[in-house]
């Protein structure tokens, strides 16, 4: 299902449903479509679901870092929602959620992390990006998932176009470096809000030990595993993911 993107002066975002505000933050390589199932599910369960388009490629080069993106999300919540929200962040979106929770705790009622960066993650490494090699990009995209068929041709084409756009390629590398540099380990014990950690057991990008460490260092956190699942649980095992998260929020 294609959702209508609202285009305001400062923000482009999807907004579906009424009720408790839920803000979904996408990752570096993931667009809004990664959250299709979540938007459908939660917008019908008494939630007001927002998916802002993060300005990953729109920032000046010198400001292309996670702190700037976290400030953007804070502004979005302040101006479009105006009250504390539940943040759900996947991959880099989780990292942005962690930064936001530690810098603007007044805006975050609950934090949900899935395949979140912030401690460490495996990146494309020194070989990124091998631009012209579509097979390589296909293989790397498939590695994100437990089930490689989720890496559809459409998704591979998106990633391929991204790494072949020189400016976007540079900014992708800068954000990946910013994620590695901005390690959150010392900040985790200071997080006061409830945190739900939902992780794919077969996540190759942010391996399971990241989830175990986050659970260990974040005081008020719960950890849930999804089996036969990689780095984007809400996309790969949507029913299970939505069920776990819905129950968790209901109990808070």
Identify the residue ranges that each predicted region occupies:
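Active-site loop/oxyanion-hole signature of alpha/beta-hydrolase fold enzymes
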Residues: 36, 44, 50-88, 243
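Flexible "cap/lid" loop of the alpha/beta hydrolase fold
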Residues: 98-103, 108-138
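Conserved HGGG/HGGXW glycine-rich cap/lid loop of the alpha/beta-hydrolase fold
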Residues: 12-59
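Alpha/beta-hydrolase
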Residues: 25, 54, 114, 226-229
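Gly/Ala-rich beta-loop-alpha elbow adjacent to hydrolase catalytic centers
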Residues: 89, 93, 97
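Conserved alpha/beta-hydrolase catalytic His-Asp/Glu region
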Residues: 131-193
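Conserved serine/cysteine hydrolase catalytic core
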Residues: 177-216, 225
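Catalytic histidine-centered segment of alpha/beta-hydrolase-like enzymes
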Residues: 229-238, 242
């Amino acid at each position: 299902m294609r959702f209508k993107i609202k285009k305001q002066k400062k923000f482009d975002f999807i907004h579906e449903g009424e009720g408790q505000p839920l803000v979904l933050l996408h990752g570096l390589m993931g667009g809004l479509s990664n959250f299709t199932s979540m938007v459908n599910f939660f917008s019908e369960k008494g939630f007001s679901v927002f998916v802002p388009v993060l300005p990953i490629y729109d920032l000046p080069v010198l400001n292309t870092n996670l702190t700037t993106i976290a400030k953007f999300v804070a502004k979005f919540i302040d101006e479009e929602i105006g009250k504390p929200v539940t943040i759900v962040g996947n991959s880099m979106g989780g990292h942005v959620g962690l930064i936001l929770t530690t810098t603007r705790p007044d805006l975050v009622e609950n934090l949900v992390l899935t395949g979140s960066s912030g401690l460490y993650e495996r990146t494309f490494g020194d070989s990124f990006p091998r631009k012209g090699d579509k097979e390589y990009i296909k293989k790397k995209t498939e590695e994100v998932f437990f089930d490689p068929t989720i890496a559809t041709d459409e998704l591979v084409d998106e990633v391929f176009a991204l790494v072949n756009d020189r400016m976007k390629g540079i900014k992708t590398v800068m954000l990946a470096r910013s994620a590695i540099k901005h390690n959150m380990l010392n900040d985790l014990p200071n997080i006061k809000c409830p945190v739900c950690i939902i992780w794919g057991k077969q996540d190759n990008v942010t391996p399971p030990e990241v989830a175990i460490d986050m659970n260990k260092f974040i005081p008020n956190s719960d950890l849930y595993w999804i089996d036969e699942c990689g780095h984007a649980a809400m996309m790969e095992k949507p029913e299970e993911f939505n069920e776990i998260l819905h129950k968790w929020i209901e109990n808070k």
